[in-house]
């Protein structure tokens, strides 16, 4: 049996895949090492989102390779191992590659390891064997055939056995994307959207809740397209009804990557009806000017988007809406950029993430004329971030004096010995949004009610007015320390 250490780069979907690999390895008797130094095999789950992510991936692979002993092996798995397999496989020290559709074979790779082995990619057009290669490049006998339909299905049926859980966990409900946005490479290595069966999702959600998870974050490349390949209309709303039927009311369900053209009346009503569903929606929009959106190959109807946001706020008055945008897309004029700023000022999103346009080889956007200079992109990024910083602060100030429920994530001690706890409200997704801080020692994984006393640009401070134990309110307060 081998000791394995997994390093995860990139998005929450990658984190779920790493947890899947971890569970498969543990089920086969392998142990997970706390560090690369202690491992027989180091797996780097790579990211290929944009050029900067690929540069980080290669840097991490080089760093791990430089430190590994002659007995250790290095596996590059995931997105960049799929999208740029030749480059990854040629990186000195990488002993094997495993693409995004192959990670359920990780135990086989670990157990049949050969020095300088590599894995042949799956051919999406026909059945194909996974063939380990010797250091001389001569094919070894393949252990057995693997058909592509099975490969696509494996990730949907493979159990995600998490060895350790925190207050929140990601649950991936689909993989791949049917959209073909001009700037995006993801469909080229993820393929079309493929949904996980509702029953499998419910089983995973119940396991997470039974393990003590208090927040389940649903993720996908395109969350609101869920179930289309299964023949479902309003698939996400149907799934949410089923999830909320099996989860206790004290478990949050959060929606991320919910594209607007999949949001309709039924989904909005479902979000408003169930107490488990956070009044929060991450809705990527990318831009707000119709001409920019057309070049992006995104729906250009900004007026429809405004109406959708109005509908969401009418049905769920306290909803926190997050969006992401791209600045510096080819041909973005100053007029188009100003229209984006005006849109943010008008709509008043609670949370916003902004990407600088990255010219990705092979995408339609890379061939567009009028590519913007990096200095212009950088200037526009800073301008839009300054605007959103002010908007975020103003949105936060609306909560002064009000009580918010907070999921406690951690605690610590200041230099002068005061205990400080930190968590998130329903308005804050893990890793990308703000936090709520308060004095005192609260137990991670519990809910507390906090009265907001200070609003910063992205975070809130407050005083605890009550704690929750299970599903019942306890009328007591954590004593403030100073």
UniProtKB/Swiss-Prot annotation:
Residues 163-394 form the Radical SAM core domain. Keywords: 4Fe-4S, Cytoplasm, Iron, Iron-sulfur, Metal-binding, S-adenosyl-L-methionine, Transferase. [4Fe-4S] cluster 2 binds at residues 177, 181, 184. Residues 397-466 form the TRAM domain. Its cofactor is [4Fe-4S] cluster. Pfam families: Radical_SAM, TRAM_2, UPF0004. [4Fe-4S] cluster 1 binds at residues 11, 47, 79. The keyword Cell inner membrane does not apply. It is an enzyme of class 2 (transferase). Coiled coil: none annotated. Residues 2-115 form the MTTase N-terminal domain. GO terms for molecular function: 4 iron, 4 sulfur cluster binding; aspartic acid methylthiotransferase activity; metal ion binding; protein methylthiotransferase activity. It is found in: Cytoplasm. Belongs to the methylthiotransferase family. RimO subfamily. NCBIfam families: 30S ribosomal protein S12 methylthiotransferase RimO, MiaB/RimO family radical SAM methylthiotransferase. This is Ribosomal protein uS12 methylthiotransferase RimO. It comes from Roseiflexus castenholzii (strain DSM 13941 / HLO8). The gene is rimO.
């Amino acid at each position: 049996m081998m000791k394995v250490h997994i390093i995860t780069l990139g998005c929450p979907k990658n984190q779920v895949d790493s947890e899947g690999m971890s569970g498969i390895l543990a089920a086969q008797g392998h142990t997970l090492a706390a560090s690369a130094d202690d491992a027989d095999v180091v797996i780097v789950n790579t990211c290929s989102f944009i050029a900067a992510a690929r540069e980080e991936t290669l840097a991490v692979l080089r760093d791990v390779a430089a430190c590994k002993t002659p007995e250790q092996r290095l596996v590059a798995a995931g997105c960049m191992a799929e999208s740029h397999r030749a480059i990854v496989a040629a990186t000195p020290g990488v002993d094997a590659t495993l693409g995004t559709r192959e990670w359920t074979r990780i135990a086989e790779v670990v157990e049949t390891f050969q020095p300088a082995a590599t894995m042949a990619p799956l051919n999406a057009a026909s059945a194909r064997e996974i063939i380990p290669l010797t250091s001389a490049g001569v094919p070894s006998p393949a252990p057995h055939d693997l058909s592509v339909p099975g490969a696509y299905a494996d990730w949907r049926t493979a159990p995600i056995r998490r060895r350790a859980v925190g207050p929140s966990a990601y649950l991936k409900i689909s993989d791949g994307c049917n959209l073909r946005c001009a700037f995006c490479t993801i469909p080229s290595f993820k393929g079309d959207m493929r949904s996980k069966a509702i029953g499998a999702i419910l089983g995973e959600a119940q396991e997470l809740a039974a393990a003590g998870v208090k927040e389940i974050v649903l993720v996908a490349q395109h969350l609101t397209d869920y179930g289309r390949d299964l023949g479902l209309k309003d698939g996400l709303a149907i799934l949410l009804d089923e999830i909320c039927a099996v989860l206790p009311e004290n478990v949050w369900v959060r929606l991320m990557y919910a594209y607007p053209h999949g949001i309709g009346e039924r989904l909005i009503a479902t979000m408003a009806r169930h107490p488990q569903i956070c009044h929060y929606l991450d809705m990527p929009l990318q831009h707000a000017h119709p001409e920019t959106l057309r070049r992006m190959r995104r729906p250009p109807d900004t007026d429809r988007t405004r109406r959708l946001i109005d509908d969401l706020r009418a049905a769920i008055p306290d909803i926190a809406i997050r969006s992401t945008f791209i600045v510096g897309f080819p041909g973005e004029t100053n007029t188009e950029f100003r229209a984006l700023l005006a849109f943010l000022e008008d709509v008043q999103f609670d949370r916003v993430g902004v990407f600088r346009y990255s010219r990705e080889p092979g995408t339609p956007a890379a061939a567009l004329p009028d590519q913007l200079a990096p200095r212009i992109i950088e200037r526009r990024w800073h301008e839009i971030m300054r605007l959103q910083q002010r908007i975020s602060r103003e949105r936060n100030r609306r909560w002064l004096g009000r009580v918010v429920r907070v999921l406690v994530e951690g605690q610590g001690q200041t230099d002068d010995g005061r205990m400080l706890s930190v968590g998130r409200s329903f308005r804050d997704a893990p890793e990308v949004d703000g936090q709520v801080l308060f004095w005192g020692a609260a137990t991670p994984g519990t809910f507390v009610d906090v009265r907001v006393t200070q609003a910063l640009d992205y975070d809130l401070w407050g005083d605890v007015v009550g704690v929750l134990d299970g599903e019942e309110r306890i009328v007591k307060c954590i004593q403030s320390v100073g």
